[in-house]
């Protein structure tokens, strides 16, 4: 089952959405300085811009589609100019269709300049944070908004702190296994539809649920199960990093399956290589316990660099080496 699908991305977000939501997820508060229709202004890029050169008159290559940040340098430059020069300098900025302007460090904009921005329909905000912190917070928020994402059919479970993505053909019991893991004390992130995001150029993948399905599960023969209502808040997770993919396969006696674990496999998810474990399914096999061991193996490798198959191989090699040294005597 291939997971290497092309990621999707938002084309833009409205300034209204940006203003209403950034304070809920990030440590920054914006205050409106004028009243314009923020729904008509859209942000198309995650990157921000400080328009120092544009204010001085050089507008070649001006990235006006970005959020414009006016810090101490820009506001003091405007304030030291005469009234006519100041208006001319600010016109070099507002004559372009910029999404919005953010003043940092509680800087003030002259009333005539604020009126110019309002006439052009440009929202102006102010924050008490410094330019450095404001740029970091706004960029991080826009990184989230413009991150690559894709929806996958499967189940996502937090097992011992390890994000395990269960995939496979319909009817193999992914939801039943996820439910069994929840009953054993682990946390459900998503079932049936798993939304996976890759933020910026990061190699980290975060999985979350579909907001409509939420933490409901469909179990064949039983119906819909509300995991949060049945098992409590401890049984659910909002977001989890994808650390391993467990693919459930129909048992095929003609197919050779991994027996030692020396041949490590991986699969690409949104361009990121993720460890892959393929598990054949047949009656009587306790997949839930195996998934727990898969998660524990990830922890062992991550924190102790320990792989059981390699440890066993090294032990066998040592026995053979000792055997050759003692001319046939078996060393235990």
From Swiss-Prot:
Gene3D superfamilies: HprK N-terminal domain-like, P-loop containing nucleotide triphosphate hydrolases. Its EC number is 2.7.11.-, 2.7.4.-. ATP binds at residues 168-175. This is HPr kinase/phosphorylase. The Walker A ATP-binding motif also binds Pi and PPi. It comes from Chlorobium phaeovibrioides (strain DSM 265 / 1930). Keywords: ATP-binding, Kinase, Magnesium, Metal-binding, Multifunctional enzyme, Nucleotide-binding, Serine/threonine-protein kinase, Transferase. Homohexamer. The active site is at residues 153, 174, 192, 259. It is an enzyme of class 2 (transferase). The keyword Metal-binding applies.
């Amino acid at each position: 089952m291939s997971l290497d699908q092309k990621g999707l991305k938002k084309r833009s977000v409205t300034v209204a959405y940006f203003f209403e939501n950034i304070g809920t997820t990030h440590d920054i508060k914006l205050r409106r300085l004028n009243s314009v229709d923020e729904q008509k202004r859209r942000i198309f890029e995650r990157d921000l811009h400080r328009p120092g050169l544009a204010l001085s008159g050089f507008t070649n290559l001006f990235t006006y589609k970005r959020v414009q940040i006016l810090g101490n340098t820009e506001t003091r430059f405007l304030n030291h100019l005469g009234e006519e020069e100041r208006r001319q300098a600010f016109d070099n900025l507002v004559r372009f269709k910029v999404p919005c302007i953010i003043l940092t460090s509680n800087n003030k904009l002259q009333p005539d300049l604020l009126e110019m921005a309002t006439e052009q329909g440009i929202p102006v905000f102010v924050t008490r944070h410094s330019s450095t912190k404001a740029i970091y917070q706004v960029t991080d928020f826009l990184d989230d908004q413009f991150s690559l994402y894709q929806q996958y059919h499967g189940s996502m479970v937090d097992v011992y702190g390890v994000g395990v993505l269960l995939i496979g053909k319909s009817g193999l019991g992914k939801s039943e296994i996820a439910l069994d893991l929840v009953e054993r004390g682990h946390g459900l992130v998503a079932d049936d539809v798993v939304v996976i995001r890759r933020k910026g150029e990061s190699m980290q993948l975060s999985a979350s649920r579909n907001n409509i399905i939420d933490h409901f599960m469909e179990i064949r023969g039983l119906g819909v199960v509300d995991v949060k209502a049945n098992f409590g808040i401890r049984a659910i997770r909002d977001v989890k990093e994808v650390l391993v993919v467990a693919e459930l396969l129909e048992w095929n006696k003609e197919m050779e399956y991994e027996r030692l674990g020396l041949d490590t496999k991986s699969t690409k998810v949104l361009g990121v290589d993720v460890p892959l474990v393929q598990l054949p399914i047949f009656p009587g096999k306790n997949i839930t316990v195996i998934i727990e061991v898969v998660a524990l193996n990830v922890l062992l490798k991550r924190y102790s660099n320990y792989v059981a198959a390699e440890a066993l191989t090294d032990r066998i090699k040592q026995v053979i080496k000792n055997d050759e040294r003692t001319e046939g005597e078996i060393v235990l």
